[in-house]
Amino acid sequence: MLIQFLLFKYLYPFPNFMQDSYNYLRSTYTNADANMWPVGYAKLVRFVGFFSHSDTLLVFVQYLCYHCCALYFFFTILDLTPSGKWAKATIFAFLFLNPAILYLSNYITSDVYFISISLVWISQLFKLIYKPGRLLLLAHLLVLLLAFTVRYHALIYPVISITVIVFCGVSVRTKLASIIAIITLISGFIYYTTGQTGKVMGTRQFSAFSGWQMASNAVYAYAHMPVRPVITVPSAFAAVHQRVTIYLDSLQHIPMAFRPDRPLMAFYLWDPGSPLQPVPGAAHIADNKVHLERMAAVSPLYNKYGKYLINQYPLQYIRYYIWPNMLQYANPPAENMSVYNDGADSVWSIAQTWFRYKTDKVYTVSDKSEMRLFDYYSAFMVFIIILFTGVWIAYLLIGGRKFTAPAFRQAFRMTTFYWIVHFGFSVLASPVVLRYQLFNMILGVTFSILLVDMYLKRARLG
C-alpha cells in the first residue's frame, strides 16, 4: 500500500482539483457549518490542517482511511460465508489494487471519504444481521450521522438502516429506541443545517443545492424537446423562463454534437453560461461567496420552477432526462476521473492559500495518458450489473436458499434492496457519473464473486 502510494505521488505531486474542491476548501478555510455542498468533508480537511496544511498528508489520510474501512468490510464479508482462495483474492484485489480508488484518493473531494464511511455503514448492517448488539447499534448511529454530513446521497441510508433494524435480532424495545434515535439525530442535523444555511447563505433552507438540481434536471429535459410549445408561465417564473427560452433559441442552429448541454451533466447547474445563473458569466462560481448567496436566494423559486416544467411535460421529462439517466446509471461517464485538474495548469486562490503553495501552478510527472483507463470503467459497470443480475437469477433458479448461510442470504437481500433504492434515488436526483458508482461496483463485485464461488463448489459436489 505504501509503495503504491509513494509511486503515485511521484507521478502526481499535487492533488487533483475540480469545481467542488474549491467550495470544500472555502468551507474549510472559514470553518463554515453550511455551504452549497455538505461540510462534513471540509471538517476532515480542517482536522488534518490542524497538524499540517500539506496536500500530501491530506491525500494520504484519505487513502489510509479508505484502506482501514475496506479492511473492515473485507473481514466482515468473510464472516458471512466460507469462500475459496480465488474468491478472497479477487475481492481483496478489487478493494486494494483498484486504480480508481488510488486516483480518487488524490482528489480534493468527498468521494473517497464517503465511500470509506459507506463501507463501514454497510458492514455494520451486515453484522447487525448475524451479530446484533447495543454497542454496534450505537456505533451505527454515529456512522450514519457522519455519512449524512458528507454527501446528500446518504439521504437514503436511514431508510436502509431502519429496514435492517426492524428485522435484526434485538428486542422490540431496542429496535424502537434505535429507530427513534435515528429519526431524532437526522432531524436535529437537518434543523441545525437549515439554520446555519440561513446564516451563511442568507436563505433559510436545508440545501440550496436541491432547488438548483431540480431546475437543472427539468431544464435539461425541456432543452432537448424537439418542439417546445409557447407557454404562459406563472408570473413568479416569468423572468427565469424568459432567460431559458432565449438561451435555448440561440442553440437552434447548433448541431447537437456541439451543443454545450449535450452530455447529461451539470451544465445548467454550474456553467457560467447557463441561463439559470443569477449573473451569467460569473467566474469561479464554487468559491464566489456573493454569487453562491444569490444562487441560494433563488433556490426555493428554482425548485418550484423545475417542478412546474416537469408537471407541464411529464412524459418528455421521462424521455429526455429520466431514461437517459437510467442508461447512464449502468454506463456512467468517467467525468472528472479521466481528467487532471479540469485540464488546467493552475489552481484557484483558495487552494493556493490553504495548501500554502508558492504559486498557483501545478504539474504532473506522468503524461496522464493512463487516466483514459477510467473511460473503460463505464463498460465495466455494465458488466458488473449484468453479472450481478445473472447471479441473482441463478440464485432463484437453483434454489440458492438451500446451500447459502442465513447471514449471507440476509446480506445479499439487503444489498439488493440498497441497490434498488440507490438506483431510484440516483436516477431521480442528479446525473449519474462514475465516481458516484464506485461503492456500488464494490458491492456488485463482492457478492457476484461470492455467489459464483458457491455455484462452482456446488457443481463440483454434484
Residue locations for each model-derived region?
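Membrane-interface anchor segments at the N-terminal boundary of transmembrane helices
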Residues: 56-64, 291-292, 299-303, 308-312, ...
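Transmembrane-helix motifs of polytopic, lipid-linked glycan transferases
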Residues: 60-82, 116, 120, 124
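Membrane-proximal stem/loop segments at transmembrane-domain junctions that anchor or position
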Residues: 206-354
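Membrane-interface transmembrane helices that cradle and orient dolichyl/undecaprenyl
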Residues: 121-136
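Loop-to-helix entry region of an early transmembrane alpha helix in multi-pass inner-membrane enzymes
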Residues: 39-43, 51-71, 104
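Membrane-interface alpha helices of multi-pass inner-membrane proteins
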Residues: 137-151, 185-193
